[in-house]
């Protein structure tokens, strides 16, 4: 197969990655190490910098799946050495309904080896001839399906682009302060729910 996924052990008590198991399974053939922070079970990985160091030592990338709702209160993946970050933007103002309201995001360092592989169109910002004015436009157009048809790296549909606008409006309305408040509220409610559930025998 072109790709082989090797699961890693984790602590049942904390949900954190078993670093000893990671060390055993890393090799020169490892392309990337991936983990979610927070995970789908709600655990928070606190050893991100160590995981990044171990991955980079064998030439692998560190890829982190992040919930944007958590980014207002948690350290961003870039802080602990992440090469690529990805996630779902459904939580950014999109109503839940049958089979819709979906979109994702990818982030990376400003390096050509990453950016040129993005599976969608790229837009850049530059100064115009009018002082203080900025313009936006397609970047690296030659890599798109418009230029190369089926050979292009980019593939994006109208629906995904529209949900991207929804997420952008949501973020602009929330602002940094609103995103911090959102993250703090989610953490507080989660801890409250866990405390109440733990009062039930057998839970």
Each model region followed by its residue ranges:
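PLP-dependent aminotransferase-class I/II
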Residues: 1-38, 42-43, 50
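General beta-strand structural signal in soluble alpha/beta enzymes
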Residues: 6-8, 35, 55, 62-66, ...
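Active-site core of PLP-dependent enzymes with the aminotransferase class I/II
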Residues: 17-18, 38-58, 69-76
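Conserved active-site segment immediately N-terminal to the catalytic lysine
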Residues: 78-93
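Active-site C-terminal subdomain of aminotransferase-like
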Residues: 89-203
């Amino acid at each position: 197969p072109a790709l082989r996924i090797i699961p890693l052990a984790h602590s049942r008590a904390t949900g954190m990655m078993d670093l000893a198991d990671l060390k055993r399974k890393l090799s020169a053939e490892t392309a990337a190490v991936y983990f979610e922070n927070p995970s789908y079970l709600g655990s928070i990985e606190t050893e991100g910098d160590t995981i990044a160091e171990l991955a980079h030592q064998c030439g692998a990338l560190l890829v982190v799946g992040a919930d944007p709702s958590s980014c207002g209160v948690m350290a961003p993946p870039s802080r602990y050495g992440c090469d690529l970050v990805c996630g779902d933007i459904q939580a950014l103002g999109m109503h839940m309904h049958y089979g819709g309201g979906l979109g994702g995001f990818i982030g990376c360092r400003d390096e050509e080896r990453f950016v040129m592989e993005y599976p969608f169109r790229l837009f850049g910002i530059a100064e115009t001839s009018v002082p203080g004015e900025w313009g936006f436009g397609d970047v690296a157009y030659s890599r798109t399906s418009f230029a190369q048809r089926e050979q292009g790296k980019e593939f994006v549909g109208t629906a995904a682009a529209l949900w991207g606008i929804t997420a952008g409006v949501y973020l602009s309305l929330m602002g940094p302060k609103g995103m911090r408040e959102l993250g703090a509220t989610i953490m507080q409610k989660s801890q409250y729910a866990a405390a109440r559930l733990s009062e039930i025998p057998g839970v």
